[in-house]
Amino acid sequence: MRKLLVSLLLLSGSILQCAWAQNADFVRGADVSWCTEMEAAGKRFYDAQGSETELMALMHQIGMTAVRLRVWVNPEQAYGAWSDKADVLAKARRAHAAGLEVMIDFHYSDFFADPGRQTKPAAWASYTAEQLKNAVAGHTKEVLQALKAEGIEPRWVQVGNETRPGMIFDEGKIDWSKSGAAAWAGYVALSNAGYDAVKAVLPQAQVIVHIDKGPDDNAWFFRDFKKYGGKFDMIGLSHYPESAWQNENSKTAANAQSLATQFAVPVMIVETGYACTNEALAGQVMADFMAKAKAAKGCAGVFYWEPEVYGWWKPSYYNKVGWNAYNKGAFTSQGRPAPALDAFAGDGTKVQAASANSAKDRNTYDLSGRRASSSARGILVTNGRKVIR
């Protein structure tokens, strides 16, 4: 028995070490799903010097290492044709060309899925529970296979968006009128259909189950989800700090470390943002949170949600539903990166490691330590010196 306990402890320690190793490869990302609609509306993006720059290239120049792209089933049935498979492919191609990794966020809806709405796609309205599982699997495979066919293999895939109450209502709603496995059965079945579909196409991809309220103690959710058969490789959290941002930042970072420890999987902050009305304060808030997230063992990275929004732009469907403009964009009114994105530039340690191996190293590196072309623009290290082009 003693040998068994020792073996189990060593195994759990190894698993945690693997999960915590993600900190050495801390992901700095952004969900930029609105960019194509913004561009169609005439919006353009500029670097710090005011030069117009393609958004994905600009994200890379800033220091981002990844982008997150949401997928809707048939958005034309809701409020517009953006974020369908074709739109996602177009954005993924651009991200891939810019050297960014990709996270795919399946909403399994024709519009936003979140704790307040997990609306079934119109085309699936009459499906039975079994047909819904097949639809989830089919939709997941279709999008991922299309990406893979173009040489784009997402590193992470979300099966559902902010699914604290479940997904694809009513069949996938967590039924709190029941207890135990019966309450979770519908949600677990649909989530697992997505998980299995991801693995069938991309065996190495990390599958994320994502919920909101990062500062809250969320262990109960994942404890029950796992207990009743739910599968996941990574935990995703949303974190939108408000006036008590220092305390909320600390809580979310602590929760990320706690969840990574309890479930032996890495935790990703897949959404964050702060009000853009005070750019300097937003920069301070994000710097504080990034420092705390990086220090949290098991926290794999942070994605800013729709930082490219500026000038109180809003998508056309916001007018149809009567919503105000998104107020957490991280670009200035001139379309340039604002201070909130300074924290996503990285610390330069990989650059130093890459260029310090040899005094004769004449390669050019970006601020993530990745080889860059001699014609690359932005903040770079070449011949052991930092340059701005």
Describe every region a protein language model picked out:
Residues 30, 59, 105, 157, ...:
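Conserved, mostly hydrophobic/aromatic
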Residues 350-389:
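C-terminal outer-membrane/trafficking sorting elements
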Residues 58-206, 212:
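Substrate-binding cleft and catalytic face of glycoside hydrolase catalytic domains
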